[in-house]
């Protein structure tokens, strides 16, 4: 049962009891994931028990079991507690800054600011996994806090053809809105995992694709390719769902609409000399988060709003009468009335935010496609989807021009999906990055498990091969890498994310092999045996 009473978004403010826990929403009309219309609904938490579902290829050694209120929660790849608004200065700052950025990125959702971006692979994508921040203190060096986007610098040339990519300069406000809706996967949609089956179908239909399993061997028939790719993708998405929803169910973490409105009710956390100071309030940021003063258009007829917090962001559904013709635009609104860029009949998914399911699903799918096709890149080095002018957007009118979403690699598409949830207003970055890390691990592990079914020796003694498992993952930099169910004859090689081999020694004892290494730097590594590849996260 939820700790907090439901929030009714059409009313201002939020007086929830616990700002660290999920809050249901009460809507006049709710359209669920399947497109069903429910009148005056308060949707329950969807799938809180999913960590207890039988997995496809998840390793029980990566599972932690928790209990609360007599219920059992199985959590795979436990990322630990997200920052809480609890009076601790460090965690309060992490919480406040993360959710404040969601409102700030809402200011990018209008074409009227005239800001132009090149959204081709020339300028976006190609994010190094080594640049992924592992500590919250490093997040602001990865995300562009005020302008939007991440640290990706794009490609100097197409990695497949070696030709330059054609630039695509568009209005940022068109791009961000298209991105938010393209990856929304909300009501009446194929859902996030289904979205990656759509991408898989398009990849499989691309005439530039050579249908070789893992990029080598004989060309597969269309039927064999489809069966194997669907089997693998289905297993990977199943495990990603179990992992993400096990975490969601246990940590039961708050969503932006609840957190932003709650902090707005408390006041501001920047200037202790002002009467509206509260250490748990929103930060004051010129041009983005300010105080309503006398003479302000938001002051109210009786100046009842003086001293309240206002935000410069997407203005919400009060400014849209006809979504086929109207745009809410960006402007100053009371923070207590903040809305995410979503449908008013959906507003925010009815389950906890941490970790981002989109980030987990997408990264797992990208890793699986990379291994299955034998290449990290879309066929021909380009995946492309077109959002037509004044046709594509559903939440409001637009875009004002054709927008081509373009990606060189599967990981580029995954990274873009993760960013879209911040612009869409349903995830802060503290939900995003752990989902990416976990998805990258699940995608590889579950692929390896499924790929073992394609071995010609599956029904012989070699069936033991898929049982090789990492004793723990992630590990710390000075911790040995240990593999269980070994026989002492395996050959292991360790590589960093750049492909450089790391010198190691091995020690075998009673069906357990220890990989001995010099202290590893934080980052992602690949451990390979004759038959299996693991992606290892070093903290």
What are the functions of these language-model segments?
Residues 461-539:
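C-terminal outer-membrane/trafficking sorting elements
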């Amino acid at each position: 049962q939820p700790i907090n009473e439901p929030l009714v978004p059409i009313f201002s403010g939020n007086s929830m009891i616990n700002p660290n826990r999920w809050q249901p929403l009460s809507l006049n009309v709710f359209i669920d994931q399947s497109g069903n219309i429910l009148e005056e609904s308060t949707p329950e938490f969807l799938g809180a028990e999913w960590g207890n579902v039988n997995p496809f290829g998840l390793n029980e050694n990566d599972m932690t079991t928790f209990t609360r209120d007599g219920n059992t929660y199985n959590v795979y790849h436990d990322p630990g507690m997200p920052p809480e608004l609890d009076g601790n200065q460090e965690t309060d700052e992490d919480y406040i800054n993360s959710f404040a950025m969601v409102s700030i990125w809402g200011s990018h959702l209008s074409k009227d600011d005239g800001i132009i971006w090149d959204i081709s692979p020339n300028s976006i994508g190609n994010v190094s996994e080594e640049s992924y921040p592992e500590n919250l203190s490093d997040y602001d060096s990865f995300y562009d806090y005020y302008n939007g986007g991440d640290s990706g610098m794009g490609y100097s040339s197409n990695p497949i053809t070696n030709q330059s990519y054609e630039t695509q300069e568009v209005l940022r406000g068109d791009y961000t809105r298209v991105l938010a809706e393209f990856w929304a996967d909300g009501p009446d949609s194929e859902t996030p995992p289904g979205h990656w089956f759509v991408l898989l179908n398009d990849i499989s239909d691309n005439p530039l694709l050579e249908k070789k399993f893992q990029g080598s061997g004989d060309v597969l028939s269309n039927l064999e390719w489809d069966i194997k790719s669907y089997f693998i993708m289905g297993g990977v998405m199943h495990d990603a769902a179990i992992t993400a929803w096990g975490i969601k169910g246990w940590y039961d973490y708050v969503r932006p609409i609840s957190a932003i409105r709650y902090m707005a009710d408390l006041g501001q956390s920047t200037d202790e000399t002002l009467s509206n100071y509260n250490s748990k309030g929103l930060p004051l940021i010129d041009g983005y988060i300010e105080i309503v003063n006398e003479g302000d258009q938001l002051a109210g007829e009786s100046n009842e709003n003086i001293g309240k917090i206002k935000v410069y962001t997407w203005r919400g559904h009060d400014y849209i009468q006809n979504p086929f013709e109207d745009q809410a635009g960006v402007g100053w609104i009371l923070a207590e009335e903040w809305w995410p860029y979503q449908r008013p009949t959906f507003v925010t998914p009815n389950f906890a935010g941490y970790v981002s399911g989109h980030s987990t699903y997408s990264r797992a799918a990208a890793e699986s496609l990379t291994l299955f096709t034998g290449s990290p890149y879309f066929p021909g080095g380009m995946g492309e989807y077109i959002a037509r002018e004044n046709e594509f957007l559903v939440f409001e009118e637009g875009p004002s021009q054709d927008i081509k979403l373009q990606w060189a690699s599967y990981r580029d598409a995954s990274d873009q999906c993760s960013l879209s949830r911040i612009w869409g207003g349903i995830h802060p970055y503290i939900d995003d990055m752990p989902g990416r890390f976990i998805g990258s691990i699940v995608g590889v592990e579950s692929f390896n498990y499924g790929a073992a079914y394609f071995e010609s020796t599956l029904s012989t003694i070699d069936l033991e091969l898929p049982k090789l498992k990492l004793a723990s993952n992630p590990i710390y930099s000075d911790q040995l890498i240990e593999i269980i169910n070994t026989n002492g004859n395996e050959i292991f090689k360790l590589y960093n994310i750049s492909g450089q081999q790391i010198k190691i020694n091995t020690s075998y004892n009673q069906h357990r092999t220890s990989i001995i290494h010099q202290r590893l730097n934080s980052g992602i590594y690949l451990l390979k045996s004759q038959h299996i590849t693991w992606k290892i996260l070093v903290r």
